[in-house]
């Protein structure tokens, strides 16, 4: 296969590179000592101090990403809600009324109409009725249990 423009084989002549005569007496660019020594390289003292980045060429940037150390995101300020405040106020009032309620005292009834002579008279106090325990068994049940335990002491 031919890789050139014409399909004819081409020949190139390689010439040996000839060193160009150097006019600068200092060290050549990119060359170090021909023999390795532990001596430090001489620094060029006559380097122009213009722009150091321009003389070095393109420098590779660091790949380290600089994030801030710790950033706490603050939540937005919650707007006051009047309906929520009113709800908490009403719940507080109901809770206080439940705590301060006295047991066994009936709640006073508000007058239905305007005050008249009958309402000014003292009303008789109704007797406080004790609540009945409808789930309690008659006392003969307790006697039956005691007689059962006397007859069968090893049952329990």
UniProtKB/Swiss-Prot annotation:
Biased composition of type Basic residues is found at: 56-65
- Which residues of this chain are annotated as glycosylation sites? 133
Task: Report the subcellular localization.
Answer: Membrane
Which UniProt key words apply to this protein? Glycoprotein, Membrane, Phosphoprotein, Signal-anchor, Transmembrane, Transmembrane helix
How is this protein situated with respect to the membrane? Single-pass type II membrane protein
Please describe the post-translational modifications of this protein.
Glycosylated.
Positions where Phosphoserine occurs in the chain: 31, 126
Give TM segment ranges. 83-99
Q: What GO biological process terms does the UniProt entry carry, in alphabetical order?
A: DNA damage response; negative regulation of apoptotic process
Question: Which ranges does the record list as Extracellular topological domains?
Answer: 100-156
Which residue intervals are annotated with compositional bias (Polar residues) in the record?
7-17
Q: According to the UniProt entry, which residues carry Phosphothreonine?
A: 18, 123
Family note: Belongs to the IER3 family.
Task: State the protein's name.
Answer: Radiation-inducible immediate-early gene IEX-1
- Record the organism: Pan troglodytes
């Amino acid at each position: 296969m031919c890789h050139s423009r014409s399909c004819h084989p081409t020949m190139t002549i390689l010439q040996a590179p000839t060193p160009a005569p150097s006019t600068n007496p200092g060290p050549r660019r990119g060359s170090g000592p021909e023999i390795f020594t532990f001596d430090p390289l001489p620094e060029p003292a006559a380097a122009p101090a213009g722009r150091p980045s321009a003389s070095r060429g393109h420098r590779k940037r660091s790949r380290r990403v600089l994030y801030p150390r710790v950033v706490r995101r603050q939540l937005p300020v919650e707007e006051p809600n009047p309906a929520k405040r009113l709800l908490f106020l009403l719940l507080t009032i109901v809770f206080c009324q439940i705590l301060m309620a006295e047991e066994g005292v009936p709640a006073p009834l508000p007058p239905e109409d305007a005050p008249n002579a009958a309402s000014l008279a003292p009303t008789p106090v109704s007797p406080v009725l004790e609540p009945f325990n409808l789930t309690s068994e008659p006392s003969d049940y307790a006697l039956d249990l005691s007689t059962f335990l006397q007859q069968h002491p090893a049952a329990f």
